[in-house]
Amino acid sequence: MKSLRLIISGRVQGVGYRDWIVAEAREHGVGGWVRNRGTDEVEALLSGDDEAVDAVLAACDRGPLYARVASIVATASEPADEPILRRLPSV
């Protein structure tokens, strides 16, 4: 089991990034949450099998069509309580 907290910055708001990451996570069986943070960041907590979390992390660098990811900071975290990734309100 692996859990990562991600801070993804760049053009990641207003381009469907949160909905895209929810779909990616569900495809790989990864739980947790995702939300907008500030004006140019998305924050996510991913929890699941090591390979599944790594696959979603690798995909995050690509993002949806109009996203332009400038950086991803990933840190180890406590596991998420949510077995299915869900979208939280922005902070």
Residue spans for each PLM region:
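Intrinsically disordered, low-complexity, mixed-charge
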Residues: 1-91
